[in-house]
Structures are given as C-alpha cells and as structure tokens.
UniProtKB/Swiss-Prot annotation:
Active site positions: 20, 38
EC number annotated for this UniProt entry: 3.6.1.7
Organism: Chlorobaculum tepidum (strain ATCC 49652 / DSM 12025 / NBRC 103806 / TLS)
Gene (UniProt): acyP
Name used for this protein in its record: Acylphosphatase
Highest taxon in the source lineage: Bacteria
Main EC class the enzyme belongs to: hydrolase
Length: 92
C-alpha cells in the first residue's frame, strides 16, 4: 500500500451546505485520516492521508460535493505524510 497526503482547497458554494460533514463521511468510509475546516474566504480546506487510491477516490467525491453544494474549483497539492495522524476530524 502506497500512502500519500494531500492538501486541498475547495471553492464555490461550499460553506453552510454540509460540505465538511460530507468530507468527514467520505474520508471515514475510506479509512483516511486528516481534517477539514472552513476558511474565512468562503473556501473549505482539507488535508487527507491514506492509501493512494482511496485518497484519489476522496478527491473525485470532493469535486462532486454534497447535493446542496456547488464546487467551482479544487486545488490539490501532495504534501509529506504525517505518521502521527490517525483519524479524520472537522476543525473549528
């Protein structure tokens, strides 16, 4: 299993529509670790880590988003794996 960690910024109608909970469910279903949070500029930030294929699946789901959202852009950058990260959570 090849692990990777990505940093993601999601733009569009992504706050106030259940986006962070959607990311939490999708990441947890794939046994990924990391976190998600709203940013003051209206975007959502995500860091996700785990099996490379499962991280890619999460990225595909984030591009779609929950039904009430409208994703206009997504920026993905691969970053260094954090071996201390064991769960996925929503940051406030």
């Amino acid at each position: 299993m090849t692990e990777k960690r990505v940093h993601i910024i999601v733009s569009g109608l992504v706050q106030g529509v259940g986006f962070r909970m959607f990311v939490l469910r999708e990441a947890s279903a794939r046994s990924l670790s990391g976190w998600t949070r709203n940013l003051p500029d209206g975007t959502v930030e995500v860091e996700a880590q785990g099996d490379s294929g499962r991280v890619d699946e999460l990225i595909r789901q984030i591009r779609i988003g929950p039904s009430r959202s409208s994703v206009t852009s997504i920026k993905v950058k691969e970053i260094e794996v954090d071996t201390s990260c064991r769960e996925f959570r929503i940051l406030t």
